[in-house]
Amino acid sequence: MMQGYFKNHTNPTVVFDAFFRKNPFDSSYSIAAGLEQAIEYIKDLHFSQEDVDYLRSTRLFDEDFLEYLLNFRFSGDIYAIPEGTVVFPREPLVKVIAPIMEAQLVETALLNIVNHQSLIATKASRVVYAAGGDGIMEFGLRRAQGPDAGLYGARAAMIGGCIGTSCVLTGQMFNVPVKGTHAHSWIMSFPDEYTAFKKYAELYPDACILLVDTYDTLGSGVPNAIRVFKEMREAGIKSNFYGIRLDSGDLAYLSKKARKMLDDAGFTDAVISASSDLDEYLISSLKNQGAAITSWGVGTNLITAKDCPAFGGVYKLAAVQDEKTGEFIPKIKLSENSEKITNPGNKTVFRLYDRENGKIKADLIAFADEHFDENKDLMIFDPVHTWKKTLLKGGTYTVREIMVPVFLKGECVYETPAVMDIQAYCKKELNTLWDESRRFENPQEIHVDLSDRLYDVKKELLNNYHRR
């Protein structure tokens, strides 16, 4: 398409919105993530001589267009919702304002990055919520769909609330805690289980989590772990973090039995960690069964988002700038499916909170130049079923614009926070959700509505089309 615009001398400034239509996992919310990597992509976006030589070899591109690519740099504006923010369907996560050749080029990369990390961050937030304050460790690198999915998926999982990751490279690159234990192969490589435990404890007395299910969890694994813990205590070694890990079997039953054995031996502060194909539903079930587990290693189902392996982000044209007046002319994509009809214009997103408790009442999509007085009544409209409207009385709500400038005239103006700072922000964001919106079964939906003015423009565009 870029060459098509180039050869037709058509390169107007346009507005594109990146958004999604449905939350994953039947959730009521999603978590925005991936902005840092999107920024890095835009900053480094260029075509090398090697790139151009390859494109030339395809025999699809003319020389004048290839020459243009050699000097290509992104020159537009980008606005986005910061990472860690709770977000909802149909509202723009990223808005690109740029010449159409530039705006069109960045589509695939932006969606790839934001879709993936938003998916994993959302899944992680659900798993963390299910654990009810217990620590969740991200253990999925070996099951991720490739190295990058493991690396950046672990980053997203940290944003969603995990206390650490087994991916050492993620720890190095993003300064997040690295956590892990030994494998069954460690046990099997020694003459016996006790020796394996003893050698591991000698190496890592302050991170001594022993995997007890290689042979017989209750018959040998837990007893041998207790033996090693006693020897550590007798030697005057006080561990800051020690315990056992269960990776198979009936985790509820085994954890309760193991807890009693540890407590009877005087190790009431020993941790019981569990892994084994965990997700938010199994963790919830185990906690409801009274499982004596306080630390969870979650791998495959988290890093692959197994029950919803794709985040349905899309990228749609919303406005074209009039070259004479400089005004943005709203554009709309129609569909027989009402949910796929886009919202036109150069827009932003406002979050409306209940003034009394700080919980989210609704999100409001509005034109970028709109402003709202919290002390005045506000009428908002459903973007799909536009005959549905809600009146918010002045003084009962507060307003916060949640989109921020990231690039202006091709220059990055946004300072990316550290991942652990994003995680802390995400935790605060999740606390603005109503309890009813966080349950896993039939959660209460948070409404995303249109401003009065945007509603009128959308209605006019729809009416104009139907009059043709």
Q: Which positions does each model-derived feature cover?
A:
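Short coil/turn segments at secondary-structure boundaries
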Residues: 53-54, 122-126, 140, 438-445
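Short acidic, Pro/Gly- and aromatic-enriched capping/linker segments at domain boundaries
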Residues: 78-84, 397-402
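Gly/Ser/Thr/Ala-enriched C-terminal appendages of enzymes
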Residues: 1-12, 25-27, 265, 278-468
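Hydrophobic residues within beta-strands of alpha/beta enzymes
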Residues: 179, 244, 272, 294-296
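An N-terminal, globular interaction/scaffold subdomain
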Residues: 40-44, 80-83, 87
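A residue-level signal for beta-strand positions that form part of recognition/binding surfaces
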Residues: 15-17, 75, 136, 314, ...
